[in-house]
Structures are given as C-alpha cells and as structure tokens.
C-alpha cells in the first residue's frame, strides 16, 4: 500500500494486479486493489474484486470490513442490496455469542450504571469533535464511564477524554476474546460501539456479548454494523425515517431529541470571513470530502450546477488530492462532464477552515453524505446543499440541517439539488447575510447544546437498561 500512500495510483494498481497474477497474497491484494478502485470511483470493478477476495478468504474480517465500507459508497446498489451483504457478515464466526455477564446487579433500584465506550478515535480526529463532549458532560454521580481505546498517538483530546473517565483500558494489542473478558470483569452494563467497520475497529468483541446491553452510535461509521449481537442502533427520525428500520441488524432506537449528536468546534477555527463572492465576482462552490464519495452521479450533478451558474468555480479539497495523479484523474472526469480545468481547484490544505473561507456554498455528496466537514461548513458560515438519500449514511447532511433549522437546503432529487444550488447562488446579498448568521444560529441550535444532549443520552441509556431488566424479570 506504500505506493498508494505516496500518490502513485497507477503504480500501486499495477503492483496489486501483478501480485494477483502471481498468486501472491491474492486475497489481500485483491482487497487493496478494490479499495484503490473505489477511491477513483470505479465501484463495479472494485466491489467485484473484493467479492472475489472474500471467496478466497471468507473468514478474513478485515476484508469483510473493507467490503462493507466500500458498499456504503456505491452509487448504484440499492439500500436493500447493501443490507443483504451486512446480514451475510452477521453469519460469520457466530460462535461464542452466548451471553455471559458477571455480577449483573438487579437487586438495587438505583445504582450507578457502568457505561463502556469502544473506539479507536479518542484523539484529534474528525470524529472526536462529536465524542469528546459526551465524555466531558457525563454525570459521574450517576454513571461510571469507561473507555476501551485504541489510540496510537495520544494527544490533548486523548488527555481530555481520559480525565473524564473512571476507567481507561488500552486495547491496542487485545484480542476480541480477551477484551470481552476484561469488559465482563469490570461489570460493564452498557457497551457502546463508536467505530462500526472503520479500520482498527473492535466489532469482534460484541459477538461475545460481554455486556447486558450493547449499542452502536452512528457517528463513527454511519450505518448498521450488521451484527444482531448488538442490541440497538442509536439514531433519530431523520437518519432512519419511518419504514426503513428493517435495513438495520440492530433495533433502531430513535433518540427523543432534535438531533442524535452534538458538536464541539476546534478552538483554533477562528472567525467567519466576508462572503468570498463579493470580492471575487463569482460564486465558489466547494467540498472537503474524500474521493470515494465523488462518484459519476455526483460529478454529473455538480457539473450541471457549474454550467448553470456563470463563471462559478468548484473547490475539491481533501487528503486524497495531495498528489497530482489523483487530481488529474478527477480533472479528467469533470472534463468528460463538460467542465474545464480552469473552473476547478483540486488539492489538499490543512487546517480545513482556511479552505472553507474561500467557499461560498458547500456541496454535499450522495448517496453517502459527508460528515464532520458539513458541520465545519456551517460553523464557517457556508450553507450547503444535500440530497436526502438512503438511510442512514445518505441522510447525515439532512440531519445537521434539520438540527439548525435549515431544511430548505435539503433536496430529494438530483434535479432539485441543482435547482437549490442555483437559487442560493443567485442572491449575493442574501448569501452574505446567511454567512454572518449561520454560526450564531448553529451555536443556539440543539447541535451545540452539549449538556442538554448528554442528559437525553443518559436518559436513553437508563431506558435501555430498564428494558433489559424487564426482559430479565
């Protein structure tokens, strides 16, 4: 994978194909090739390669993780087709899932519940902006908080989270079986997955059912784990609209709150600047998403917007585009869609808010929406257009907009998406006003009310626990 990390896309692809032809590490090579292809938007070939890899090594959980991860981004598969693959994952390695809890205390009516969080992102990552506020605001008079953390690089976020825990277990080198034993020994009541199928996850521990109650919270992965061993999927009515609950292996628990997460901005973000279009003389659309979300449907839709808004530009900025070869691949894709290179600014800059200051209107991706960068758009005064697509990964953008009271930027078709983007760009005076109002609106919204959100979350944990006790009685 080193060539891929260095931006040598063609060389990496050739290396993987040669390894496959020589029958060298064939399954892992096919899985790596698949991920590389999906990153370039070649989903049909990529998914076919990874399915072949699974046929060669059906018990390889890492390949299964990559397979399910890539499926979420496919622009052509239906939600039902994708969920079928998740159900197949549930049948893997189903042994050792018999409940085996130690010291489940049911005699006392009121006691501290022990909550355990399993995550590999308890450091300065995009997901930590949602996770850190939970740890900071937990009521430790009512709950004991434990972190089961895989953190290669400890930083100030790690220290902050750790300081609000009653217990911290480093799980880097622990097997799922050993971790399950540790969780049982500590008497954890409710175990929370914060990673889903992202790299380095510890989903395997949940197959052992080491705690009486378990749930997966959408912020780390965005969709079902596929594991029936996990009791609940924590979301809300926007992410999982009525009638779509059957697309989740877990029972969907919709939080009784305007949104199912809370966001703490990076303290270094800085202030909101004036609308760039006022000095540029043209509208700049933009995204900070990874390349895997930029499928042909998205590119066609964005190209139609650029064609309809005279002299407009598009910024595409993320770590996938730090090297020239990936830039050229997507410049060519837009060229085929009728957009010349001089209207594109593709690259990578950090921190993200410096790029966001150059953007007038954000464009969300579909069928898998963007995540943290959408909230950062809003915090920097940038409205964005999103397409409400399949649950729940395709409704993240809608979730944030509903939380701050701007559902008018949610589209329900690609045609409506184009129309909304064009309408928003047509009135610079209104767009400038929106830019200055968005941060105060967001700060006053449920998305920024940390204490209130965590209070509702804790009430949810207590309700889940009461349901367990009722079943056990």
Could you say what each language-model-derived stretch is?
Residues 387-388, 393:
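Conserved acidic donor-binding loop of glycosyltransferase catalytic domains
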Residues 1-282, 300, 328, 332-339, ...:
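Alpha-helical solenoid repeat scaffolds of the TPR/TPR-like class and their adjacent stem/linker regions
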Residues 149-153, 313-328:
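Glycosyltransferase donor-sugar binding loop
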Residues 118, 288-290, 317, 347:
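Short hydrophobic "strand-cap" motifs at the C-terminus of beta-strands
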Residues 301-308:
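Hinge/capping helix and adjacent helix->loop/strand transition within the periplasmic-binding protein
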Residues 394-405:
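Short acidic/histidine- and often glycine-rich active-site loop of Leloir-type glycosyltransferases
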Residues 377-379, 402:
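Short alpha-helix at the nucleotide-sugar/activated-sugar donor binding site of glycosyltransferases
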Residues 286-297:
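Substrate-binding clefts and catalytic carboxylate motifs of secreted carbohydrate-active enzymes
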